[in-house]
Swiss-Prot record:
This is Alpha-humulene/(-)-(E)-beta-caryophyllene synthase. It comes from Arabidopsis thaliana. It is an enzyme of class 4 (lyase). (2E,6E)-farnesyl diphosphate binds at residues 262, 299, 303, 442, 445. It holds the Pfam family Terpene_synth_C.
Length: 547
């Protein structure tokens, strides 16, 4: 049947990791010697952190180093307690007005507090303006200060004009500043301009910062060695998780049964790794990666395989949540396979959630997938009718078709201690942080994949809808959508500030998923074009850091 049907197949780039099981070989770094050294260094780093409390500003800088080197998770409770105490008891706005508190320092203080949900006033940057309300010209001679200002400005929320000005000011000068900086600082500036720390994938940022920190005069050898060993030990765990997912994929015979989808095991794992890298989330990464593989197959099935009649039958079955697709339903075997594997996967998770005492969570998990499928179905209907939706119609459906509701819900599954039924109910209520993440996901993807999707029959994107409704150029539509994404980041930043409605670890999943989108889709669709992610995958999963 399938060979007689005219299908909207996409010419997806081939998978570049033929066998992750052999590509990502095990290392011998998981020895007791390294683990013992790691434990000893951890105590030394903790002692240094505790000693830094005597100087509040140096303490903040130490926290910044811990975060950027990827080891702050070891001391998270101590860090939050210290920041909480400092924020409540110390007058940081007054402290930063002191003459010795330079732009570099103020930028770090601002970043660290906001990173942990403390909304330090943006007025701390007023001291760097002249009598005309402009940032002082001499600041451009301070490379570290300008970079710190740029990174701090990524944490802006709505109504903070000085942060908008700081971002424009720092960004406009950093390219030139990098040309006259030392080689390692120039690389750091260029990396930041491409992907700011706040919008980067944590593991990628850590790997880059370790190389940078090693060249700094202020480098703490103990902290550096601890960060290197910690990275390498975690890398072993991450490789084992990828191997687990790969075995599952092979055992399901996924590649032979669904030939038209993007087979992106390694890239899907990187997506999960960007969502949470810490060891306690090992099972969560495995489950989320499996889900991403299923989501990819669903997306490609709706977008680049199924006919309208087949997709309607598939969607109806999912809405009813049939345990399997009956033989009499006339859809291709590959679509039946996707359906049956997906429903079985979700039903198994539902059973596990029930056993854990989290009754009802599975209902919301399934509902998130059903809504995503209906979002895909709506796009298929628009394509069939050759209908260009209004921008508002598109935006409403795009929140569903982004798939980020289903993905965020999936990241909650293995967060047993904090993701109870109320968390899933809250997520289903369209909280602002979820909507912001969905907008970032859908519109960033639209902008980056516009050219590829217009090479074949494809539903009108947000860019097309905006151009049609308002009679503007593609360039203007892209600019508007970019502004919408920027506003969504401000919404997301605001929702991360205290007081929190739900535990901060849950909010961090939403933030980290948005960060993955920025890395995967800001410039091109790197998930579809895996060569664009190869360098990151090699640095995170293949190459160990020399000790």
């Amino acid at each position: 049947m399938g060979s007689e049907v005219n299908r909207p197949l996409a010419d997806f780039p081939a998978n570049i990791w033929e066998d992750p099981l052999t590509s990502f070989s095990k290392s011998d770094l998981g020895t007791e010697t390294f683990k013992e050294k790691h434990s000893t260094l951890k105590e030394a780093v903790k002692e240094a952190f505790m000693s830094s409390k005597a100087n509040p500003i140096e303490n903040i800088k130490f926290i910044d180093a811990l975060c950027r080197l990827g080891v702050s998770y070891h001391f998270e409770k101590d860090i939050v307690e210290q920041l909480d105490k400092s924020f409540d008891c110390l007058d940081f706005p007054q402290m930063v007005r002191q003459e010795g508190c330079d732009l570099y320092t103020v930028g770090i203080i601002f970043q660290v507090f906001r990173q942990f949900g403390f909304k330090l006033s943006a007025d701390v940057f007023e001291k760097f303006k002249d009598e005309n309300g402009k940032f002082k010209g001499h600041l451009v001679t301070d490379a570290y200060g300008m970079l710190s200002l740029y990174e701090a400005a990524q944490w802006g929320t709505h109504g903070e004009d000085i942060i908008d000005e700081a971002l424009a000011f720092s960004r406009s000068h950093l390219e030139e500043i990098s040309s006259r900086s030392s080689p390692h600082l120039a690389i750091r500036i260029k990396n930041a301009l491409k992907h700011p720390y706040h919008k980067g994938i944590s593991r990628i940022e850590t790997r880059q910062y370790i190389s940078y920190y090693e060249e700094e005069e202020s480098c703490d050898p103990t902290l550096l060695e601890f960060a290197k060993i910690d990275f390498n030990l975690l890398q072993i765990l991450h490789r084992e998780e990828l191997a687990c997912v790969t075995r599952w994929h092979h055992e399901m015979e996924f590649k032979s049964k669904v030939t038209y989808t993007r087979h992106r095991i390694t890239e899907a794992y990187l997506w999960s790794l960007g969502t949470y890298f810490e060891p306690q989330y090992s099972q969560a990464r495995v489950i989320t990666t499996m889900a991403l593989i299923l989501f990819t197959a669903l997306d490609d099935m709706y977008d680049a395989y199924g006919t309208m009649e087949e997709l309607e039958l598939f969607t109806d079955a999912m809405d009813e949540w049939l345990p399997v697709v009956p033989d009499e339903i006339p859809i291709p075997d590959s679509m039946k396979f996707i359906y049956n594997v997906t429903v079985e996967f979700y039903d198994k998770l539902d059973e596990e959630l029930e056993k854990e005492g989290r009754s009802g969570c599975g209902f919301h998990l399934k509902k998130s997938l059903q809504k995503t499928a209906n979002g895909y179905m709506q796009e298929a209907k628009w394509l069939k009718k050759d209908y260009i939706a209004t921008f508002d119609e598109y935006k409403e459906n795009a929140i569903l078709s982004s798939g980020y509701y289903a993905l965020i819900a999936m990241t909650f599954v293995r967060m047993t201690d904090v993701a109870k039924l109320d968390a899933f109910e809250w997520l289903s209520s369209h909280p602002k942080i979820r909507v912001a993440s969905e907008i970032i996901s859908r519109f960033t993807d639209d902008i980056s994949s516009y050219e590829f999707e217009h090479k074949r029959e494809h539903v009108a994107t947000g860019i097309d809808c905006y151009m049609q409704q308002f009679g503007v150029s593609k360039e203007r539509a892209v600019e508007v959508m970019g502004n919408i994404v920027s506003d969504a980041w401000k919404d997301l930043n605001q929702e991360l500030m205290r007081p929190h409605v739900f535990p901060f670890p849950l909010l961090m999943r939403v933030l980290n998923l948005s960060r993955v989108i920025d890395v995967f889709y800001r410039y091109q669709d790197a998930y579809t074009n895996p060569k664009l992610l190869k360098e990151h995958i090699v640095s995170l999963l293949i190459e160990t850091i020399p000790i």
